[in-house]
Amino acid sequence: MSKPVNLVLLYGGKSGEHEVSLVSAASVLKHLDSEKYHIIPIAMDKSGRFHRHDYNDLLACSDKLPVVTEKSTPLEGLLINGRLAVDAKIVFPVVHGPLYEDGCLQGLLELAGVAYVGCDVLSSAIGMDKDMARRLACINGLKSARYKLLSWHANASERQQFCHEVASEFGWPLFVKPCSLGSSVGIHKANNMDELNAAVADALRYDEEILVEEFIVGREIELAVLENSIPCGKPRVSMVGEIKVNHPDGYYSYTAKYLESSQTDLIIPAQLNNSLEEQLKQAAANIFSYLKCKGMARVDFFVNDKTEEIYFNEINTLPGFTSISMYPKLWQATGIAYPDLLDELINLAMVHHNCRQHLVTNYL
C-alpha cells in the first residue's frame, strides 16, 4: 500500500459564512479515507489566526468542527517563509466567502507552490462576483434576472434615488444581494420601499457592491458540475436537483438553508421533461467552460413555471459540503459516492498542480 498523502483540511475563516464552513468541514473529514490521506485539520478563527488540530481529536465531532480546543496548536500563519507551515502536499479548502472563494486563497496557495482542490484564481474571482459571472455566463443568449448595481460609496441621496429607480423599473418584490457573498448571507426579499431601504443598508454591511434584482416566478434548480478526468473532456454534469422552500422567509434564505432546513425540500431528481433537463445540463456545462472552471462548481438556475424559460442565477466554485448540501447529494444520486467524489477532486487538483510545476518560469 502506498504511503498516505499529507492533506490539509482548511476550514473556518474571517467571513459571514464561517459557521457553514465548520459544518462542511465535519462532513468532509468524515468521508475522507484516512488510509489514503494523512489529514491535517487547520482552522482559521474569525480574527484570522490559524490553529492546527490532530485528526484523531476531531473524529467525534459529527456536526461541526471546532476552531480552537485545549489540544489545538496555534500557528504563526498558514505560510512560513513563503511555504506551507505544515508538511503537506495538498490543501482541501472548505472555506467560504470573500478571501476564500474569490481567488485570494487560491493565489496564496499557488505562490506557496502547493496543490489545492477546486477552481483556480481566475475562475474563483469571476464566479464569486455575481455581476461578472452573469456577464460571461449569458454571452450566448442565456438570460438572468434583470438587476442593477449599487456601490458602498454611494451617498444617502444616491442610495435613495437608486431604490426608487429599481422599484419603478422592476416592481415588487425585489431581491437584494451582496455581489460577492454566498450561503444567502445578507440577502433579503423586499416587498415595499421601507423593506428595500433596510435591505440595502444591511447588504452593504457585507460587501462593497450589491445588486438588486427582479423577482423571477419559477422553480429553483441546481446542478453539480465536475471537471472531466480525461484531458480536454467535456465537464461532467449531475442529474438535476430542485429546491422547494416552505419556509416563512419565502425564499432559500440562510435560515431556511441551515437553521430550519426541515422546511425546505431538496428534490433529486427534479421532475422535468427531457428537453428541459438537457437544456439545463448543457447550460451548466457551458457556464463551467465559459468561466474556465477547474475541479468543481454548482450552477444554479430559475425556470419559469409557465414558459419553461431558463434564467442563470449564480455559480458557486466552492460549494458547501454539509450533509444537506446539494453538491455532494447530487453526485451521490448520479452515482458518485461522497468518498469517491473527494478522491476525484483531489486527483484533479494534483493534475493541475503538476501542470503548473512543469511550466517554464525562467526566461534566461
Swiss-Prot record:
Cell compartment(s), UniProt: Cytoplasm
Cofactor mode of binding and number, as noted: Binds 2 magnesium or manganese ions per subunit.
Pathway given in the UniProt record: Cell wall biogenesis; peptidoglycan biosynthesis
Any matching Pfam family: Dala_Dala_lig_N
ATP-grasp domain location: 134-347
A GO cellular component annotation in the UniProt record: cytosol
Lineage: superkingdom: Bacteria
Keyword field: ATP-binding, Cell shape, Cell wall biogenesis/degradation, Cytoplasm, Ligase, Magnesium, Manganese, Metal-binding, Nucleotide-binding, Peptidoglycan synthesis
The protein's name: D-alanine--D-alanine ligase
Binding site for ATP: 167-222
Residue ranges of the TM segments: none
Binding site for Mg(2+) 2: E314, N316
Binding-site residues for Mg(2+) 1, renumbered to this chain: D300, E314
Reported cofactor(s): Mg(2+); Mn(2+)
Family membership: Belongs to the D-alanine--D-alanine ligase family.
Molecular function terms, GO-annotated: ATP binding; D-alanine-D-alanine ligase activity; metal ion binding
InterPro entries membership: ATP-grasp, ATP_grasp_subdomain_1, D-Ala_lig_Van_CS, D_ala_D_ala, Dala_Dala_lig_C, Dala_Dala_lig_N, PreATP-grasp_dom_sf
Enzyme Commission number(s) from the entry: 6.3.2.4
Main location: cytoplasm
A single GO BP: peptidoglycan biosynthetic process
UniProt catalytic activity: 2 D-alanine + ATP = D-alanyl-D-alanine + ADP + phosphate + H(+)
Cited function: Cell wall formation.
Keyword Cell wall biogenesis/degradation: yes
Broad EC category: ligase
